[in-house]
From Swiss-Prot:
Gene Ontology biological process terms in this record: DNA biosynthetic process; thymidine metabolic process
Active site: E95
Recorded coiled-coil stretches: none
Pfam families named among the record's database cross-references: TK (PF00265)
Family membership noted in the UniProt record: Belongs to the thymidine kinase family.
Protein name, entry field: Thymidine kinase
Catalysed reaction, written as an equation: thymidine + ATP = dTMP + ADP + H(+)
EC number: 2.7.1.21
GO molecular function terms noted in the UniProt entry: ATP binding; thymidine kinase activity; zinc ion binding
Biased segments, Low complexity type: 193-213
Designated gene of the protein: tdk
Length: 213
């Protein structure tokens, strides 16, 4: 089970940032919901946010791939979170990779104001490269939890999200219809689709045949 920092009331205490990251289908949203519900049980004031563009399962709820849901507030920008989370003890943010770098500064300010901030997001894009702003969050957070899915090919722990379509956008919304988890060995980053890359490789040079007498 992922490590979780001790839940404390924030009356006069210093806040902190928790990061939950990993590939698709690794349980990031599920873990976020679990922590937020525990905070609610502890009678803390909880506010949950997600990017408005993410309507895959619900327009308003934070929903895991297992369809576990928690009511949230969709926002268009990170700055809105500052205005809406003023009275919260605990702030949860899902799909952080769909926000810009401003979200890091917003969460820093919330933590400095004594709030517990829990951020969940994808840490790599479909090419296997770091996906902002998650690397920056991992650098400033007090607690980082890295989750793994199960490789759809071999069953090993999966750290990558394999895109199954030909779409080239760095961020393409989707679920099992567009992605599956892959381990390092089974992950195949898409190849460039430029004209030059589609040319067949030149045949290997062969030694000349000896002349017959």
């Amino acid at each position: 089970m992922p490590m979780e920092p001790l839940i404390l009331r924030h009356g006069g205490s210093v806040g902190w940032i928790e990061v939950i990251c990993g590939s698709m289908f690794s349980g990031k949203t599920e873990e976020l919901i679990r922590r937020l519900r525990r905070a609610q049980i502890a009678r803390q004031r909880v506010e949950v946010f997600k990017p408005r563009m993410d309507r895959r399962y619900s327009e308003t709820d934070v929903v895991s791939h297992d369809e576990n849901a928690l009511r949230s507030t969709p926002v268009d920008s990170a700055e809105q979170i500052l205005l809406l989370a003023d009275s919260a003890d605990v702030v949860g943010i899902d799909e952080a990779q769909f926000f810009d770098m401003t979200l890091v500064d917003v969460c820093q300010q919330l933590a400095n104001d004594g709030k517990r901030v829990i951020v969940a997001g994808l840490d790599q894009e479909y090419m296997g490269r770091p996906l902002e702003p998650m690397p920056q969050f991992m650098a400033v957070a007090e607690y980082v939890t890295k989750l793994h899915a199960i490789c759809a090919v071999c069953g090993a722990p999966a750290n990558h999200s394999q895109r199954l379509t030909d779409e080239e956008g760095r961020v393409v919304l989707g679920a099992a219809d567009r992605y599956e988890p892959r381990c390092r060995r089974c992950f195949q980053p898409p190849r460039p689709t430029s004209t030059s890359s589609l040319k067949a490789p030149a045949p290997a040079a062969t030694a000349p045949r000896p002349e017959l007498p």
